[in-house]
Amino acid sequence: MSLFNVKKNDKFAVLEVGMDKAGEINNLTQIIKPNLGVITNISYAHIKNFKSLDGIARAKSEIINNIVEGGKIILNQDDEYFNFLKKIALKKNIHVTSFSKKNSLSDIFIKKIITNKTNCKIFIKIKNLTKTF
């Protein structure tokens, strides 16, 4: 686990928290105690141990329960579970930042993505500022 590679003096770490069943994200994020979380989408990738997308959404929402108070969660506004996840976050006093490829009013709007064999270029709008990566 990459968490064991984090040194005491490190100011931040980017950690992926995976899951195969309900409770796994909760257990891992109790250890990590994140300031910031990202849920990219709710999809059938984890369906083998769940009965529905609702179950997957509930399991992924476990990260929100362990974000420090006043922390942040970044959510995909294009996902059908956006409002479900946002509601949980707001109840926990977690700031929600949205991203979208469809809704130009989201906090982070993905205007265009260009890919080829050697690189990827992403054009995003954050508030009124357009950036290219």
Residue spans for each PLM region:
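N-terminal phosphate/diphosphate-binding loop that engages ATP/GTP or pyrophosphate donors
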Residues: M1-N5
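Helical "lid/switch" subdomain of P-loop NTPase nucleotide-binding domains
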Residues: V6, K21-E24, K60-I63
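A generic alpha-to-beta junction signature in SAM-dependent methyltransferases
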Residues: V6-K7, I32, I67
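Short acidic/histidine-rich motifs immediately flanking catalytic phosphotransfer sites
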Residues: K8-K11, G70
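Switch II (G3) loop of P-loop NTPases
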Residues: D10-A22
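Switch II of P-loop NTPase G domains
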Residues: D20-I32
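Acidic, Mg2+-coordinating active-site environments of NTP-dependent enzymes
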Residues: N35-F133
